[in-house]
Amino acid sequence: MLKSLNDEVLQSHVERFNEGVRSGDFSRMLEQFTEDAELAFEGVPVGPFRGRPAIAQAYADQPPDDEIVILRTRESGENLVVADYAWRAEPASRAGSMILRLRDAEIDRLLVTFG
């Protein structure tokens, strides 16, 4: 089965995120966001961050310390990807969901939920 463009963007985002966790450099991941993108979190008291510079600053100020793995894609629409994720340290335990809204194969909005 061929992967959809949305699934490819999700897979690329996870690979680039994990690369950033390992190296401390999230610049390749940030390239996937539109200039006016929004990063929001549900279940933790941070954000939202609007615009690529604000998102970059958020990752610089509070870099994640664990990689993520995708457990399953629950739903995928024309411009939307919803995926359950886990932290690599606990790959069998669902940590939350990532909801990516796309515009021209770039991330326009990313909502990360915990729990």
PLM regions: where:
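Short glycine-enriched, charge-decorated loop/helix-capping segments at active-site entrances
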Residues: 44-47
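Short, low-complexity N-terminal intrinsically disordered segments enriched in polar/charged residues
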Residues: 1-31
